[in-house]
UniProtKB/Swiss-Prot annotation:
Any Pfam family hit: VPS9
Protein name: Ankyrin repeat domain-containing protein 27
GO molecular function, one term: small GTPase binding
This protein's encoding gene: Ankrd27
Biased composition (Low complexity): 638-650
Region spans: Interaction with RAB32: 451-729
Length: 1048
């Protein structure tokens, strides 16, 4: 069938032909010829009498056609080729063909062509026809659908079987069920590759929608229309009572103009076919044909004046009363509620609005047998206002519901969806479900047939349900509510997209996790073959990729290809999403799968960096055993990093005052949690640890489980219950204190990566701040090593011990000073960190700061009283490790003398303050650094107010006259550091055991160095910015010679 259609009786060219050349019309009928009629959209304007109509009348001859003026024409397929006699030998498309009969029953054919024959080759193409494409009969639909109709028959048969079980459901239920059937059939149609291309054109997509709707409704018409008729029985009876009382109504009584009376019988006959139409689309086409007939001229030679809205409504009122249709209300409800394919704003929608306004006018009792003069002007005004109002009512109840969902207005959503609950309550109050007594009929009347009632199954013109809209707009709070109301999690729209598809496409991770929790399928493919994972990779939504993969790597298949054969890894590699690629590779995404172009993900790599990542994983996967082949626990440590997936994981139990957790879980679950913490993905951490919103609200008032001893392990008393709730183990076996094979807990990872938002939450949920990894490092070590000030402060405020040592003997202060983080070092000193503690090499924090050439840290330690005379195991002091004539050497020589000279200063107030301007005295040009922390004011902590005299246990420096037998330069000591194999794990590998550098070193004599606890200095400086205006500056006059350190 043709894709284009129009009413040729209203075509300007055909009307002009009948008006100006009726002789040609008679002749073509006598010879059974063909008339060529250009489509309405191709005509420039009115057709004049000077037009060469003879060129458009074809007479059949041998093998071809000839026009009445002797020009040659050939018809080949669906095109007309002009021959001899035409100025331009064009090829004109044939749009469609119709057969007409005259009064003598003589037939002739009319071919509607794309444009006039006089059009030149250089002229512009005709504009689109004014009328939209449309299908008229069920035969046209079957011809259009072809073999696809067989697939629809199976769905329709299934609908017939289930309809009987739900026959007494509400009208909204049946609207939703028919819409679901329509959506399913449309999805099957759009899977056809050829039709999928055509669907990109709006006109063709509308045509497909019309075809599917008409075919579906044709087969279920008896069921649905019978049900609607039952629902509207009382309304139809009331309306019929009114129309039956108006049978004496005359045309003049309602103002029908005489010139329109001629067409009323034809329009009435056409309207009588309404109940023979088996779909809303056909019924609307019937109404449009009625309107067209009423505006048609009684004679083709006489044009009627344009019909205005008043004239149209007058004729419609007369037809509604006089036509023997007993179920107007059922037809109106059926057309309005079961029309899914078209918009209410098109021409058919206008016809429906006009009929609806006329019906409403009659229902109001405004129509009577009064003469037009006696009829009140207000009644006619009401009719026009009613029609205008109906034409403006484009917002349906579904639109209102979706608008509230998109804006997150949960109260309105609950109110709209609670209307369906009222129906259920009414059913429960009935005598029995099938009761039809007077009381029960009153109870359910007005509700079952209320189309304004919306449900979680309702769909819009795109086939989307409320759950689709909530997922598309990221309204996570509404997901729970809609699912609790029965929303179908895996419902698909016209394009085959589920809510999970839309959530992943838009990057709403919280919505994705919720949908997965409610068993949303990750394997559903849309019309393009894309799963939710494909869309998440296409749009670079890394958080959603992790949610899909981490939720259940077994359920989320990574090898599914779309219609192009591309897997998720193909797409991520093509767009260069490094984080997504690593996530997919870590969870077993295949790198050797080929798409339809025979391309592997390696070949699709965007650049060399992406290629190297995949090649490295491809090679390592060939050598590495599968996870199932690796034992649950192994004495050797994994070579792979956390980001590349450990070969195995174990859960370590931390033995403190709370109960011991013993969890056995696959290593993948632990790696998921640690990666989520490292990435700062709060939503994923919440999901894996099963933290609820209430848990996050309760952490402010909760008691830390670290310092709480339970009455017994299962105690739920008021004292233990809050801590039990926060320290619970989730269903997947994960908890806040779970560790991997290397001993890293979530708190370790949060401290290492500076996740200031996660550290407080982990601590409040029972994370142990003293947990040690295999290198015996606590989270505070990692935070200080990386210089994460806020994390270190949070840990110290949570009673983390500042003097714990790792396997190498390093304290958090030594780690901070080694890396040059002076602010973190100052924080540790304020919290009582031991300033002279030594590691396994005998190095103090000052040694490490000097070897790292961190001037500010050295100055900080000296002013806090760090000893410059302590020897390490190589018998070096801090000064021995400094470069000669350097700024650090000057500090080591001058500052201790400056601090010692403060002992002779008498202070009236033992709590006085000393400003650190000493460095300006001995070298004012040395420090002009911005934001130096030691330009702040320091307060003397010891209330004694003065330093004690040095005792006989004073530490002595090494005699410089002794030759250096170590074979190393005093000015350039080497600082040993451990480097990891993986670049992204350099921070973790720093804490691995490294004892080779200490082997064979002699122990230093005890008498050469005092223990840190016996330092002669008993007062310490702390930062105090507020004191700068409270105490006068204490000036110490020292010369370089006076402050110098004497040589031994």
């Amino acid at each position: 069938m043709a894709l284009y259609d129009e009413d040729l009786l209203k075509n300007p060219f055909y009307l002009a032909l009948q008006k100006w050349r009726p002789d040609l019309c008679s002749k073509v009928a006598q010879i059974h010829g063909i008339v060529l009629v250009p489509c309405r959209g191709s005509l420039p304007g009115s057709v004049q009498a000077s037009c060469q109509f003879e060129s458009y009348v074809l007479v059949p001859t041998e093998g071809h056609f000839q026009t009445l003026d002797g020009k040659a024409v050939v018809i080949e397929g669906n095109r007309i080729k002009l021959g001899a006699g035409f100025a331009c030998l064009l090829s004109v498309p044939i749009l469609f063909e119709e057969t007409f009969y005259n009064e003598k029953e003589e037939s002739f054919s009319i071919l509607c062509i794309a444009h006039p024959l006089e059009r030149r080759e250089t002229s512009e193409e005709p504009s689109a026809p004014a009328d939209p494409f449309s299908l008229k009969t069920i035969e046209d639909v079957r011809e259009f659908l072809g073999r696809h109709s067989e697939k629809f028959d199976k769905n329709i048969a299934s609908f017939h079987r289930t309809f009987r079980e739900c026959e007494r459901k509400s009208l909204r239920h049946h609207i939703d069920s028919v819409n679901a059937l329509y959506t399913k059939c449309l999805q099957q149609l759009l899977r056809d590759s050829h039709l999928k291309v055509l669907a990109k054109q709006e006109a063709q997509m509308n045509l497909m929608k019309q075809a599917v709707e008409m075919y579906v409704h044709h087969d279920i018409y008896d069921l649905i229309f019978k049900y609607v008729g039952t629902m509207e029985a009382s309304e139809d009876a009331a309306f019929n009572k009114i129309t039956r009382s108006l049978q004496d109504l005359q045309q003049k009584d309602i103002g029908v103009k005489p010139e329109f009376s001629f067409n009323i019988p034809r329009a009435k006959r056409e309207l009588g076919q309404l109940n023979k139409c088996t779909s809303p689309q056909q019924k609307l086409l019937c109404l449009r044909k009625v309107v067209q007939l009423m505006t048609q001229s009684p004679s083709q030679r006489v044009n009627l004046e344009t019909m205005c809205a008043d004239d149209l409504l007058s004729v419609l009122l007369y037809l509604l009363v006089k036509t023997e249709i007993p179920n107007w209300m059922a037809n109106l409800s059926y057309i309005k509620n079961f029309r899914f394919s078209s918009s209410a704003k098109d021409e058919l929608g206008y016809c429906l609005t006009s009929v609806e306004a006329a019906i409403e006018y009659i229902r109001q009792g405004s129509l009577s047998t009064k003469t037009p003069d006696a009829e009140g002007f207000g009644d006619r005004l009401f009719l026009k206002q009613r029609m205008n109002l109906l034409s403006q009512m484009t917002s349906t109840p579904i639109d209102c519901l979706f608008k509230h969902i998109a804006s997150g207005n949960q109260k309105e959503v609950e109110r709209l969806l609670s209307q369906d609950d009222q129906d259920k309550d009414a059913m429960q109050k009935m005598c029995h479900p099938l009761c039809s007594c007077e009381d029960c009929e009153k109870l359910i009347s007005g509700r079952l047939n209320d189309p304004s009632v919306v449900t979680p199954f309702s769909r819009d013109d795109r086939g989307q349900t409320p759950l689709h809209v909530a997922a598309l707009c990221g309204q996570a709070s509404l997901i729970d509510f809609l699912v609790s109301k029965g929303a179908v999690v895996n419902a698909t729209d016209y394009h085959g997209s589920t809510p999970l598809h839309l959530a992943c496409q838009k990057g709403f991770q919280s919505v994705t996790l919720l949908l997965l929790h409610y068993k949303a399928s990750t394997e559903v493919q849309d019309n393009n073959g894309n799963t939710p994972l494909h869309l998440a990779c296409t749009y670079g939504q890394e958080d959603c990729v992790k949610a899909l993969v981490y939720y259940d790597v077994q359920a989320c298949r990574l090898d599914i290809g779309n219609e192009k054969g591309d897997t998720a890894l193909h797409i991520a590699a093509r767009w260069g999403y490094e984080g997504i690629i690593e996530t997919l590779l870590q969870n077993g995404a295949p790198t050797a799968v080929q798409n339809r172009l025979k391309e592997t993900p390696l070949k699709c790599a965007l650049n060399s960096k992406i290629l190297s990542i995949m090649e490295a994983h491809h090679l390592s996967s060939d050598r590495r055993p599968r996870p199932s082949e690796v034992p649950a626990q192994s004495p050797t440590r994994s070579v792979d990093s956390i980001s590349q997936g450990s070969s195995t994981s174990s859960f370590s139990s931390i033995s403190v005052s709370f109960r011991q957790e013993e969890v056995k879980k696959d290593y993948r679950e632990v790696e998921k949690l640690l990666r989520a913490v490292a990435d700062g993905d709060l939503e994923m951490v919440r999901y894996l640890l099963e933290w609820t919103e209430d848990d996050l609200d309760d952490v402010e008032d909760a008691i830390s489980t670290v310092d709480l001893e339970f009455c017994h392990p299962l105690c739920q008393c008021p004292k233990c219950a809050p801590a039990q709730k926060l320290a619970r183990i989730s269903a997947n076996g994960l908890s806040v204190n779970v560790t991997n094979q290397d001993g890293f807990s979530p708190l370790h990872m949060a401290a290492l990566h500076g996740r200031t938002d996660l550290v407080p939450l982990l601590l409040k949920h029972g994370a142990y701040s003293g947990a040690r990894n295999t290198s015996q490092a606590v989270p505070l070590h990692l935070a200080c090593q990386q210089g994460h000030f806020q994390v270190a402060k949070c840990l110290l405020d949570s009673n983390a011990k500042p003097n714990k040592k790792d396997l190498s003997g390093n304290t958090p202060l030594i780690c901070a000073c080694s890396a040059g983080h002076h602010e973190v070092a100052a924080l540790l000193l304020q919290h009582g960190a031991s300033i002279n503690a030594c590691n396994n090499k005998g190095n103090t924090a000052l040694h490490e700061a000097v070897m790292g050439r961190h001037t500010l840290v050295v100055e900080l330690l000296l002013f806090y009283g760090a000893s410059v005379d302590i020897l390490n195991k190589r018998q070096y002091t801090a000064a021995d490790c400094a470069e000669q004539d350097s700024k650090i050497m000057e500090l080591l020589q001058v500052v201790p003398g400056c601090v010692a000279s403060l002992d002779s200063v008498e202070e009236a107030d033992h709590e006085g303050y000393v400003t650190v301007e000493i460095r300006r005295k001995w070298n004012p040009k040395m420090y002009n650094l911005p934001e130096e922390p030691l330009r702040r004011q320091f307060c003397l902590i010891n209330p004694g107010g003065r330093f004690q005299e040095r005792t006989s246990r004073e530490t002595m420096g090494r005699d410089r006259s002794v030759p250096d037998l170590a074979g190393r330069s005093l000015q350039e000591p080497e600082k040993q550091r451990v480097t990891g194999k993986q670049s992204d794990l350099s921070d973790l590998s720093r804490y691995q055991t490294s004892e080779e550098g200490n082997k064979g070193l002699p122990e230093r004599p005890v008498s050469r160095q005092a223990a840190p606890g016996h330092r002669p200095m008993v007062r310490r400086h702390t930062v105090n910015d507020a004191a700068i205006l409270q105490v006068p500056e204490v000036t110490v006059h020292l010369t370089t010679h006076e402050a110098s350190v004497p040589q031994s």
